[in-house]
Regions:
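Metallo-beta-lactamase
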Residues: 2, 10, 16-18, 34-36, 72-75, 79-121, 128-129, 155-171, ...
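Residue-level detector of beta-strand structural context in well-folded domains
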Residues: 1, 24-26, 102, 123
Length: 200
């Protein structure tokens, strides 16, 4: 696992040769139990590292296409699962908790829904006002730029952009943008989001 911009955040990844990007997962280490976000399957080394940090208490999935290795990790570590409430009726993994817009499942973490993405109520997560975590809707296929999912995969592109603008209005101090697919932005992330949200 790799360290990120905060001492309590780490990531592990898997390279996708077709898209030429990494798929990313996150660990948020907490005294009250670690939280995994959109977890890929663990390599033996990553599992050993995670267990050395206390394992996983919770797994938070931003959308049904980012279930990834959640089921096997939950079974192996006894972690409880959190999913987007808008997908509750058809979510592929049983969840112990459902969250939606404005919820705070853990102190310091605020949930926002991305409307118009490819799945209903996709979650974006804002951590302590300065870091935002996106699952599918916002991504980066090259460094220092952000993009949306291809329009053919979005339900309503303008709704996605409006959701991003709303997040920026509510959290003007965002500086770091972490994505499930592609390059993360560790500086000037708010500016990159503003550029994306202003795109036609």
């Amino acid at each position: 696992m790799k360290r990120l911009h905060r001492p309590d955040l780490l990531t592990w990844s898997a390279y996708d040769p077709a898209l030429m990007i990494d798929f990313n997962s996150l660990v948020w280490t907490r005294p009250d139990g670690n939280v995994l976000i959109d977890p890929l399957s663990l390599t033996a080394d990553d599992e050993k590292h995670l267990r050395s940090m206390g394992g996983a208490a919770w797994i938070l999935m931003t959308n049904s296409d980012h279930v990834r290795g959640a089921r096997e990790i939950a079974a192996g570590m006894g972690a409880r699962a959190i999913g987007p409430i808008a997908e509750r009726d058809a979510f592929p993994v049983p969840c112990d908790r459902w969250v939606g817009d404005g919820d705070q499942p853990f102190p310091g973490l605020v949930v926002h829904e991305i409307r118009g993405s490819k799945t209903p109520g996709e979650l974006a997560l804002v951590l302590e006002e300065t870091t935002v975590i996106f699952g599918d809707a916002v991504r980066a296929h090259r460094a220092d730029t952000l993009m949306l999912l291809p329009e053919a995969k979005l339900r309503v592109r303008n709704d996605v952009l409006q959701s991003i603008r709303r997040i920026r209005t509510l959290h003007p101090r965002i500086e770091h943008v972490l994505v499930g697919d592609g390059w993360c932005s560790f500086r000037h992330g708010g500016t990159l989001l503003d550029e994306l949200a202003g795109s036609a």
